[in-house]
Amino acid sequence: MRRSTVNGCAVSFCHQPNRGDCLNEIGPIGYEAAHAHAERLFRQLLPACGLTVREGQIKLCHTMLDALYNKEVALCDAGVGLGKTYAYLVACILWQLQRPRPLRSPVVISTASVALQDATLQEYIPFLSRVLIQYGYIDTPIRAVLRKGKERFACDLRLQERRLQIAQRGERFAHRAALLREVGRCLDLDHVAGLSRYDRRHICVPTHCDRRCAERESCRYQQYLRESNGPTITIQVCNHNYLLADALHRQNGWKPLLRDYQALVVDEAHRLPEAAQQMATCRLSTQGLAQLAQQLSGLHLTRAAQQVTACARALAGVYAPQQNEANAGHGDLPPVQVPFTVTKDGTLALAALQKTLAEIQDTYRVRLTLPLLHQLKEMRTRAAAFAQPDDTTVCYVEYSGIKSGPGLSHLSLCAVPRDLPRQLYDLLWRQEKPAVLTSGTLAAGGDFAPARRQLGLEGGTPDRKSVV
């Protein structure tokens, strides 16, 4: 597969048996025809190109087609090696063909693992694309794109600045200079092995891009966005966190991260609640405060940095005793989590933090960057939430066993919403778009009830189930 800013699928033909009554770029197809084409693909055409006929795979595809055509959610418990990826790819593509070409929208495939994303883009989609072209189902390759956070891509302007800095440091930095030259050829930072975290942080696309940027027209990242949101994209692939972030943007009326889509596939669906909890958790950490202090110090706001560091140490001093008490008699390792309790000392430390952050905002507003102002405001909001927690969240203290800085224990105050399944329903299922959820662990003993509850599907969402 050709690597580019958008993952286009190169087409190469497998051995072509007698085409017989094969189609020439089929037009819109209906429900019955879609099921008939699924049978033909899995029993004749795909086996002719090297795949094995699997009855479970065919059953899955029919269940998925039913859900897509009836605007339902399909819950599919299917083990490893059954071929569920081809099942949902075929179902989605046949379902897309029900509409005239100008009215087709992409589908989104969300997974939990990078390995599955890579396999989908580099193996499954190219193979299926050439088979469908060979037998006249489509006349152009399936175009799929990997969508992920902007911090994983290079900013051309920041890259130029960083390369200039490294070039001035001589031969000792030759290896880093070579890596930065490679970034000039590869937009995706995840594909540049050996790149340090420090360099990544200094060359990635910033949180807020300046619309007046001199490089905007030639910017590779902007080109990637234009191509990703173009009309020729059939499939968008992302991870669960990116899917949920897009849903959150839509819920809040912000600019969506994904192009509007007509159906959703969630592979490794048992990992979706975990991703939702990770994103919904309100977290105030000593590590975050230490990083804030470093940013302030970088702007030569030494006094402000010292104030934030003092607040972080005070917070660690209040909650570190819980670590020691809970661990008494159980060795040197701290527990991962302990319940959060409201104490007088804790309330005072959180109040002092809120006051300090507010003073920094007011005193240095002109010198602070917009992202830093947002960060200060967000930390104030979190500190206030822990100073007066309510019944809508479950609060705890989390320890990592490492240090955030000299004499500073790394701990986080965490708050998880109690109504997480309801939030998932509001984010993903309330819109009543058809969806396919698949995993090898959705049905415990054939019972989907626990998974439905965790996934937020108990709000009246119509669904159909399949165990293969």
Where do the PLM segments sit?
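Signature of the SF2 helicase/ATPase Hel1-core->accessory helical subdomain module
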Residues: Y88-V90, L94, A115-D118, Q122-P126, ...
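Walker A/P-loop
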Residues: N70-V90
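A contiguous, basic/glycine-rich beta-loop/short-helix subdomain that forms a polymer-engagement track
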Residues: P206-T234, A247-K255, E359-V468
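Pre-Walker A (Motif I) flank of P-loop NTPase domains
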Residues: Y69-A74, S105, T234, K433
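Conserved beta-strand -> loop -> alpha-helix junction used to position metal-binding or nucleic-acid-contacting
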Residues: P106-V114, G136-A154, D260-R271, R283-Q291, ...
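A substrate-engagement module of RecA-like helicase motors
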Residues: N24-P47, E55, R99-Q236, H240-N241, ...
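N-terminal pre-P-loop "Q-motif" helix
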Residues: T52-L68
